[in-house]
């Protein structure tokens, strides 16, 4: 116990704090006051230490900068062994610390631990009384410090494991469950189909269909059927859409096929507009140099025409079928059409059939005689 003189007493000391006994000197009173102050300081520090250890069971942080409060439904504590376990619903990890893992930790593990202390400064006492109070509570503070030690082994995939090198790949594998595993599995199963494998045989057959000269739409299908020309013209998907990557080069190749060295894209694009009304292809709106084939329209265009109007029966094909029917006919002998008995004029327009105008007598135009109308004499 340290004895202080009366000269060093603070001016704010109340008279009730001094226990004055009759017949004693003032130095004994000062010693009694110092003993009372020391007891009060120890009681206050014990109350502060109890308040520090009486924090809620989920109210201390893992790292600097993290939130101090964790939801109670995620943190479970056992007050007897101070064992903490947390199930992370993202990675499925069991984050826990136990006495076995902390007991087997080496000096290297002690260096990697993060210690968190909850300290509060003593602002009520000063002087020698505060110094003695801090020295008296140092041993109790060290005994309570293990409560706030959070081992880095809590982030191991298996509780109580001794090998940290073994836990690192396990943690990386579990942490990438929702970020990398699904992405890698989905990237191979949903690959885009190759349009050249799907549309290649069809475009090749249509490019060489029909007889006669190759048309422009057939020439484009011929280029699209060969993947070597993908640098100048290529498919855009599997629905018949294609794009002229180098329209000038496509026009030059079309000019070589038609022996027209002055061919350019402007002339070729005008020829492509002719196929819009034929439902062979169409321009893709909003995209430059993009077109789309209509395979149903191409199939209808390749079908032979059928006679749907009366004038279609008198075309060259119809007349070719009718000509053999008239080949055996010669010049018409219309005299064979005369019926017997009608070549005599007396039997036609005589008075017996009431044609009086022709049978009247005494007329000036000599109509009394029977008029004969010979037929093809």
Swiss-Prot record:
Localization, UniProt: Nucleus; Cell projection, Neuron projection
Pfam families to which the protein is assigned, alphabetical: Ets (PF00178)
Residues annotated to bind DNA: 214-294
Biased composition (Low complexity): 96-109, 118-142
UniProt GO BP: axon guidance; cell differentiation; dopaminergic neuron differentiation; nematode pharynx morphogenesis; neuron differentiation; neuron fate determination; positive regulation of transcription by RNA polymerase II; regulation of nematode male tail tip morphogenesis
Keyword DNA-binding part of the UniProt annotation: yes
Domain of life the protein comes from: Eukaryota
Molecular function terms, GO-annotated: DNA-binding transcription factor activity, RNA polymerase II-specific; sequence-specific DNA binding
InterPro entries: Ets_dom (IPR000418), ETS_fam (IPR046328), WH-like_DNA-bd_sf (IPR036388), WH_DNA-bd_sf (IPR036390)
SMART domains per the UniProt record, alphabetical: ETS
Gene Ontology cellular component list: neuron projection; nucleus
Physiological role: Transcription factor. Probably binds to DNA sequences containing the consensus motif 5'-CGGA[AT][AG]-3'. Positively modulates expression of dopamine pathway genes, acting as a terminal selector for differentiation of dopaminergic neurons; may act in concert with homeobox proteins ceh-40, ceh-43 and ceh-20. Required for axon navigation in some interneurons, perhaps acting in the same pathways as basement membrane protein nid-1 and unc-6/netrin. Plays a role in the differentiation of the ventral cord pioneer neuron AVG. Required for morphogenesis of the pharynx.
Protein name: Transcription factor ast-1
Organism: Caenorhabditis elegans
Gene this chain is encoded by: ast-1
């Amino acid at each position: 116990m340290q004895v202080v003189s009366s000269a060093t007493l603070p001016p704010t000391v109340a008279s009730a704090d001094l226990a004055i006994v009759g017949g004693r000197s003032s130095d004994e009173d000062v010693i009694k006051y110092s003993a009372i102050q020391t007891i009060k300081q120890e009681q206050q520090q014990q109350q502060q230490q109890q308040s520090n250890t009486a924090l809620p069971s989920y109210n201390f942080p893992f790292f600097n900068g993290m939130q101090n409060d964790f939801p109670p439904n995620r943190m479970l504590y056992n007050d007897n062994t101070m064992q903490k376990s947390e199930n992370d619903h993202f990675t499925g990890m069991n984050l826990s610390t136990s006495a076995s893992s902390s007991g087997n930790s080496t000096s290297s593990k002690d260096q990697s631990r993060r210690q968190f202390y909850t300290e509060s400064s003593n602002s009520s006492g000063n002087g020698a009384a505060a110094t003695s109070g801090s020295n008296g509570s140092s041993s109790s503070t060290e005994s309570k410090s293990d409560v706030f030690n959070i081992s880095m082994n809590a982030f191991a995939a298996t509780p109580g494991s001794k090998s940290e090198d073994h836990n690192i790949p396990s943690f990386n594998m579990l942490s990438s469950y929702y970020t990398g595993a699904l992405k890698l599995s989905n990237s191979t199963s949903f690959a885009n189909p190759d349009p050249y494998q799907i549309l290649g045989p069809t475009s090749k057959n249509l490019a060489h269909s029909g007889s006669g000269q190759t048309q422009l739409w057939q020439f484009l299908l011929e280029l699209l059927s060969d993947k070597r020309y993908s640098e100048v013209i290529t498919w855009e998907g599997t629905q018949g859409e294609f794009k002229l990557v180098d329209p000038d080069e496509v026009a030059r190749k079309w000019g070589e096929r038609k022996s027209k060295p002055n061919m350019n894209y402007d002339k070729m694009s005008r020829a492509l507009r002719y196929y819009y009304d034929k439902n062979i292809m169409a321009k893709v709106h909003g995209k430059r140099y993009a077109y789309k084939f209509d395979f149903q329209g191409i199939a209808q265009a390749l079908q032979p025409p059928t006679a749907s109007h009366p004038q279609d029966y008198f075309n060259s094909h119809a007349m070719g079928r009718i000509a053999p029917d008239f080949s055996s006919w010669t010049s018409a002998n219309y005299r064979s059409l005369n019926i017997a008995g009608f070549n005599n004029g007396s039997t036609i327009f005589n008075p017996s059939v009431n044609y009086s105008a022709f049978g009247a007598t005494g007329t000036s135009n000599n109509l009394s005689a029977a008029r004969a109308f010979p037929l093809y004499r």
